[in-house]
Amino acid sequence: MIVKSAYRKVSGSYTLFGVAAVIDPAGYRAGVAIIIFNRQKKLFWAKRVRQNAWQFPQGGVNEGETLKQTMFRELKEETGLDPEDVRIVTVSKQWLYYRLPKHLIRHRSEPLCIGQKQKWFLLKFIGNETKFNFNLSEKPEFDDWQWVSYWHPMKEVIVFKKQVYHRALKAFASYVFRHRSEKIEHGQEPPPPPSLSA
């Protein structure tokens, strides 16, 4: 799926770090989000630079990019990983949306961006942990990382992303914990998803 420049006719694009970013007619920036899991069914969880805020890698689609190209570009820029370090397990069937809080919306921007719509990629990590490197971008997103239990991100993600994280994790759980016998034998079955009010 290529995000075409036709978007510009109905909505528009704006320049972010010198690159045209795609915004749909409703004001949502098109992007990808990435969940990486390892052999122990733990998830890659990264800390934003100089903040006590943790999240999954994510980023916006540049005009003319496919979603897969965007995902691999963001993967490299934000984590240092290459395509051979991961295997694509699945991609969300639908766009998952989140709206920005009012104080984060740049009301003077044209076109107006009110949030993000994301395709979520589930990747299995098959590389070496020494490949993780946050210094490949001029403006690194992260400065620390850890492997965490499956639902752990729901405890720490910023409140306005909580619902979209919940939907993605719920949709991907059956891919991470594929076989019932494996779940029981290794004690790796995730607990039921936490409620969004928690």
What residue ranges belong to the model's regions?
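Acidic, metal-coordinating catalytic segment for phosphate/diphosphate chemistry
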Residues: I2-R39, E110-P111
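Gly/Ser/Thr-rich helix-start
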Residues: V32, G60-V61
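Unchanged
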Residues: V61-V159
